[in-house]
Amino acid sequence: MALTIETDVLVVGTGPAGASAGALLARYGVRTMLINKYNWTAPTPRAHITNQRTMEILRDLGLEAEARLYAAPNDLMGENTICASLAGEEFGRIRTWGTDVRRRADYDECSPTSMCDLPQNYLEPILVKSAALDGCKVRFDTEYLGHEQDADGVSSRLRDRLNGEEFTVRSKYLIGADGANSRVVSDLDLPLEGTMGKSGSINLLFEADLDRYVAHRPSVLYWVIQPGSDIGGLGIGVVRMVRPWNKWLAIWGYDVEQGPPEISESFARRIVHNLIGDDSVPLKIEGISTWTVNDMYATRLQQGRVFCAGDAVHRHPPTNGLGSNTSIQDSFNLAWKIAMVLNGTADESLLDTYTIERAPIAKQVVCRANKSLEDFPPIAMALGLPQAKSADEMKSNMARRKEPGPEAQAQRTRLREAIAGTNYVYNAHGVEMNQRYDSPAIVADNSPDEVFRDVELYHQASTRPGAPMPHVWVYASGDGHRISTKDLCGKGNFTLFTGIGGAAWQDAAAAVSRQLGVAVTVRIIGPGQAYEDHYGDFARISEIIDTGAILVRPDFHVAYRATSLPADAAGDLVSAMRRILGRQSERSSALRVTSRAI
């Protein structure tokens, strides 16, 4: 008789989306099984840029300190260099990831965390371990074969790749986080827009001590312009730091029309030595793989009881470093909703807001990452590469900028402008931090639309419903230690911020608990309260007066705001929470299932 295992949620894939979904669901008390058809997590670095929003999620899980043990800090990320080779001449640099003194305050002001470089092969085990420690059942060598769903759940067919036996997992919900070639997406036939395989890239993982070439200009990425560097891939050669300064990933392109080439170790060594510019450097090739640049996103992320997340639904090049970040943020949006539906405090209609909120983000990041590819050709154009008919002519065109005279001066100007034009590739802080949601799980307050300085380049704090709760430091009244407003919310719970005149909101939160069974943590900020606003930053950024309130969802997004105390605070808050949870008609009473409370 075939084995059947029961669980609340089955997650397919242990990449950033799947591993974070497993960790979050387990933390929220949901019975979860996490599977991977391979024998361990990602063996190669893959994604690596880890932005502040993602670090906030790791912080919410209590994993920030562990993540930083394996990450290169922000200070080592910023001297992005464009050069002929690491040992050769430079064409220019651009300060990146907020390391420019003119941008650092923007980054420091918006989050209690800083971004870092955390390769995927170090990140995934942290998340998987967290999931397992919180009770998630983790199985490797377990392949997803297909599923059938009905009104009560999902039956997924799996294969144990160690013994070849097939078995069934019966779950309330299924999450497909199985990458850009997602079988779950294919089974659901989710609508996809865009193009796959636009160009081809070669990844060469290698060890080499390159300290003397890079330690004085620390960066994550070194962009190398050489003959052939404009063919396929990203349109430019790359040497990426994996571990400073002895583990690296070289990226070179290939013509996708001709298919991936056969890459011998000697060929790989030649590419790497050319990028370094010094054949005498000892090196060890540790891995060779190919991949393609994609431009595709799903317009619907779910069907019935099955959801898809991560690269399965947004497939794009690594420019802007959005891949693993967006994947983890997908799971942060979805996990609390599933948990609250399973424990009976939310209606299943809440789950529909996953697509409503995250599909626009999927489109945004795919479009931004592909648009960023267009920012590199002007550098090659300024150096005269496309015009050259031979390697010698290419070198001559590049050298011309070192001459005196108006022609060379014009070339230098074009080059500086072209390099500066990559600013939206590296410092698009708004793309990372300005995500806004508009769905039934957000109670609009009819405030005017925000006017952004530059929605892609600069973070803009707001407590307008749908925006992420802003970070400011407040101070514990007992010992005076600072704590972020972000640290006062999350952890799978709703949080209500108010001022010293908002004591009535405590009664309102109690009414929500009494009538809806949902706990709301109340944070009163003000003199003599548990948390004080010594610098006035909370008063400045909250956009409410002392009697108003800001309701924050478990995923840090503002769900409801009252700029002042309404006549019936309890009635208003209960009504808002009913809408957020989809319980206007109280249909959820029929949906209660056995699960540990969130």
Curated annotation (Swiss-Prot):
Query: Does the record carry NADP as a key word?
Result: yes
Record pathway: Xenobiotic degradation; (2,4-dichlorophenoxy)acetate degradation
User: What reaction is this protein's catalytic activity?
Assistant: 2,4-dichlorophenol + NADPH + O2 + H(+) = 3,5-dichlorocatechol + NADP(+) + H2O
The portions of this protein that span the membrane are none
The positions annotated for binding FAD are: 8-37, 301-311
Q: Which cofactor does it need?
A: FAD
Tell me the Gene Ontology biological-process terms attached to this UniProt entry.
2,4-dichlorophenoxyacetic acid catabolic process
Q: What class of enzyme is it?
A: oxidoreductase
Q: Which InterPro entries match?
A: FAD-bd (IPR002938), FAD/NAD-bd_sf (IPR036188), RIFMO-like (IPR050641)
Listed GO MF terms:
2,4-dichlorophenol 6-monooxygenase activity; FAD binding
Q: Which UniProt keywords apply?
A: Aromatic hydrocarbons catabolism, FAD, Flavoprotein, Monooxygenase, NADP, Oxidoreductase, Plasmid
Query: Is Flavoprotein there in the keyword field?
Result: yes
**Where on the tree of life does the source sit, at the highest rank?**
Bacteria
SS bond list: none
According to its UniProt record, the EC number is 1.14.13.20
Function in brief: Transforms 2,4-dichlorophenol (2,4-DCP) into 3,5-dichlorocatechol.
**Family from the record:** Belongs to the PheA/TfdB FAD monooxygenase family.
Subunit text: Homotetramer.
Q: What is this protein called?
A: 2,4-dichlorophenol 6-monooxygenase
- Give the organism, scientific name: Cupriavidus pinatubonensis (strain JMP 134 / LMG 1197)
